[in-house]
From Swiss-Prot:
The keyword Protein biosynthesis does not apply. GO terms for molecular function: cyclin-dependent protein serine/threonine kinase regulator activity. Involved in G1/S and or S phase progression. Interacts with CDC28. GO terms for cellular component: cyclin-dependent protein kinase holoenzyme complex; cytoplasm; microtubule organizing center; nucleus. Keywords: Cell cycle, Cell division, Cyclin. Disulfide bonds: none annotated. Residues 63-91 are annotated as: Disordered. This is S-phase entry cyclin-6. It comes from the Eukaryota. The lineage of its organism: Eukaryota, Fungi, Dikarya, Ascomycota, Saccharomycotina.
Length: 380
């Protein structure tokens, strides 16, 4: 198998014995902590445009308290003009501009398409926003050095980089990679794993994700082969049962790509922007600084950066707030901080993710890495 990536054991990476946590058991379970409850922000309601005596004023939106007074004023003016036999059109002398917080209902355009199930879209995504909170790791076990499950960021980066390479060689779906990383992080956030069992855990998470997402998955012998002896077929099967039971068989992840596609609707489905957003989102998921953030939040961050790369003057208006699940940049100062941190990490990486960069340098992914990297380097 020429396409099989080199095992971790052949890579020039030094691992200290102190990186290994846990001496007695390969997988040692400690009770799971409660996850943080995050709820998406609510969106602003539509204001209704009014008609005054059959004269439609499309560009002016009037407050409710002012509507009746202006209507009476226009009626008096009209009678006065008619009494003077004037034929000039009646127009207000001044028009006060009123800021209107509205979002465009783009789902209504797809009502006639049965495949888009537009009438159920809001209910579906409301469920996904609730479900994604349940699928988060209990905490960021990489950044929390006081955690009993703490693992060095360099070790996770090594595992993720190898996982991306194996995923690419097996020609799996993007959703499979995201689910595998989610399973890995959730398990490591509540279990202590010995160093020599980390690769077994990594390939097992990919094996579970393939079973869940793929129509035709590689043979289990191929999963064991790419580990170069670190995992056996029997070992993968036993680890699979242990991982699933530890996670309560809860593996239905609201996929980050669903949120990217949702926000992309507000961007008129721009292919170039969405390709850049896919790379940025995949990078953020692989990066050790953002594993505690919701997929919808990472999707919004990725689309925001991608749109800025495409057009520096792009705005995150009410439509984007609605289709991102209520993420308002102006009222969320942490959002801008995470954006700056992500841009900085892409420009000057803290972790080794060479396989991911190489993946998005290829023509089949639009070679978007170069454009994203150049922009981030200028903005850092």
């Amino acid at each position: 198998m020429n396409c099989i990536p080199s095992p971790i054991s052949e890579r020039k990476i030094q691992i200290n014995n102190e990186d290994c946590i846990g001496k007695e058991n390969a997988f040692h379970t400690i009770p799971r902590e409660s996850s943080i409850n995050l709820t998406p922000h609510s969106t602003n309601e539509k204001k209704v445009l009014s008609e005054v005596n059959s004269n439609k004023i499309d560009s002016l939106q009037l407050p409710r308290g002012k509507l009746q007074r202006d209507s009476t004023h226009l009626e008096k003016t009209r009678k006065r003009q008619l009494s003077n036999d004037s034929t000039d059109p009646i127009e207000p002398k001044t028009v006060k501009k009123i800021k209107c917080h509205q979002w465009k209902n783009l789902d209504s355009i797809e009502m006639d398409d049965p495949f888009m199930v537009a009438e159920y879209t809001d209910s579906i995504f409301s469920h996904l926003y609730e479900k994604e909170i349940q699928m988060l790791p209990t905490h960021n076990y990489l950044m929390d050095t006081q955690s009993p499950y703490h693992l060095k960021s360099s070790m996770r980066a090594l595992l993720i980089d190898w996982l991306v390479e194996v995923h690419e060689k097996f020609h799996c779906l993007p959703e499979t990679l995201f689910l595998a990383i989610n399973l890995l992080d959730r398990f490591l956030s509540q279990n202590v794993v010995k160093l020599n069992k980390l690769q077994l855990l990594c390939i097992t998470c990919l094996f579970i994700a393939c079973k869940f997402e793929e129509v035709k998955l590689p043979k289990i012998t191929n999963f064991a082969y790419v580990t170069d002896g670190a995992a056996t077929v029997e070992g993968i099967r036993k680890a699979e049962l242990f991982v699933l039971s530890s996670l309560g068989y809860n593996i239905s992840l609201p996929n980050p790509l669903n949120f990217i596609r949702r926000i992309s609707k507000a961007d008129n489905y721009c292919i170039e922007t969405r390709n850049m957003a896919k790379f940025i989102m995949e990078y953020s998921i692989c990066c050790n600084k953002f594993i505690h953030l919701k997929p919808s939040y990472l999707a919004a961050m990725s689309m925001y950066i991608a749109r800025k790369i495409k057009n520096e003057n792009s705005k995150w208006d009410e439509t984007f707030i609605h289709y991102s699940g209520g993420i308002d940049i102006e009222s969320d100062p942490a959002f801008k901080d995470f954006i700056s941190e992500l841009v900085e990490d892409i420009a000057v990486p803290d972790t080794n993710l060479d396989s991911l960069r190489l993946k998005y340098k290829k023509p089949k992914h639009g070679m978007v890495y170069f454009k994203v990297f150049d922009w981030c380097k200028q903005k850092r």
